[in-house]
Design a protein with these regions (language model features):
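Hydrophobic faces of well-ordered beta-strands that scaffold small-molecule active sites
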Residues: 4-14, 31-50, 75-83, 103-107, ...
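SEC14/CRAL-TRIO lipid-binding/transfer domains and related phosphoinositide-recognition modules
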Residues: 3, 7-28, 46-62, 66, ...
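N-terminal active-site wall of soluble small-molecule enzyme domains
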Residues: 46-100, 111-116
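N-terminal cationic-hydrophobic initiation segments that often serve targeting/anchoring roles
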Residues: 23-26, 30, 68-72, 96-97, ...
């Protein structure tokens, strides 16, 4: 892990209205000293291919570059793509690398191939990589423990800038805070 600026994340940016609300928040309630606001734009393999989704938190992929550019115009926000797929990660990463205004990438993927992530980082050293620590980090019994989380994170040493413990995998369910 690198010594990057920590962040407080807000995800689900879809519209100009969302950006305005985030900017209002950033102006009226700046993050604690030493932190920054992360502005997350959700992208899936389906939306990346131009498909629609019923989840209102995913913008059309055609709108993503403009959202990221507008977020990047404000120094108080850090534009991050949260990406999920089940297969074809290397090809998807090549496409995502073309998002010039993206400054962070969180892969909501179980066991992303370290070599594919490292190749992405070589192509886009300006993009900070967030490793989602999800169910793939569980130990043999299926439990997330501090040791199993540490082992999972260690596999991405040198490529992950941050690790986000997300045992709910984006579903918002409670986790054991003693583990987190």
């Amino acid at each position: 892990m690198s010594a990057r600026t920590p962040y407080i994340g807000i995800t689900g940016i879809v519209t100009a209205g969302d950006i305005h609300a985030l900017r209002t928040l950033a102006w009226k309630a700046p993050p604690p000293f030493g932190y920054r606001w992360m502005a997350g734009v959700l992208v899936s393999a389906k939306t990346l291919a131009g498909g629609a989704t019923t989840n209102a938190r995913y913008p059309r992929f055609a709108d993503v570059p403009a959202l990221l550019e507008e977020l990047g115009d404000d120094t108080r926000t850090w534009p991050v793509v949260h990406f999920n797929c089940r297969e074809g990660l290397a090809g998807h990463l090549r496409t995502l690398a073309g998002l010039e205004a993206m400054r962070g990438l969180q892969l909501n993927v179980q066991n992303p191939d370290r070599g594919e992530v490292a190749a992405f980082k070589r192509d886009r050293p300006d993009v900070e990589f967030i490793l989602q620590v999800n169910a793939a980090a569980a130990d043999e019994s299926g439990a997330l423990t501090p040791d199993s989380i540490r082992r999972y994170i260690d596999r991405y040493d040198g490529v992950a800038d941050f690790a986000l413990v997300d045992a709910s995998a984006g579903r918002g369910t409670a986790i054991d805070l003693a583990v987190a």
